[in-house]
Amino acid sequence: ITGMIQRQLFPDEYDNVDEAVLNAAATYGTNVHASIEDFDKNWNNDGTVEVADYIEICKEHGLVHEASEYIVSDNKNWASMIDKVYRVSDDTFSIGDIKTYGVMTSEKLEKARWQLSLYAYFFELQNKKAKIDKLFIIHLRNKIKKDGTVDHINEVIFVNRIPSEICKELLEADLKEENFNNPFSIPEAVSYT
């Protein structure tokens, strides 16, 4: 799903980013995900600031962990893993995605909104009696910057769900190898010269 979102909606996002920077960011993100998953599955707190921040966020927002790396699919063409599923009630759940970006740009926020909305669509498709309550990013970071200061971020960012019909249109366009006409994109500036 993330590759399709990248291809259809954000094809130029990483064009000017050094590969070593991308690899370092991916390694850091993978390590944070693994630490948090170990806490949720095994109650193992590895002592990292990110896990401590995650525990605090769960307490502050009343998050009741239901599943990590939960696989969702349309049972035909698409499958992906939801970072975190939290139980709200017997039939209601919220979905969280862990991000470790240094800066949460508007583009990254919109990308996560699409990702979470597609996850919500698939989750409800595969769990007919379930409904999704909230979608949010768990933004965690604790890295030393080049100047020696610590880049410490621990926040929850709620996103508005994109309607399932629009999510389906995106998926169908990609399957047909067509460009998706994003109804949420901001038009290019027009020059009057």
Regions found by a protein language model. Give the residues of each.
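Metal-dependent nuclease catalytic cores that hydrolyze phosphodiester bonds in DNA/RNA
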Residues: I1-A79
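Mg2+/Mn2+-dependent nuclease catalytic core
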Residues: E66-E172
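Charged phosphate-binding loop/patch that engages nucleotide di/tri-phosphates or the phosphate backbone
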Residues: E178-P187
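Conserved small/polar residues in nucleotide/adenosyl-binding loops
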Residues: Y192-T193
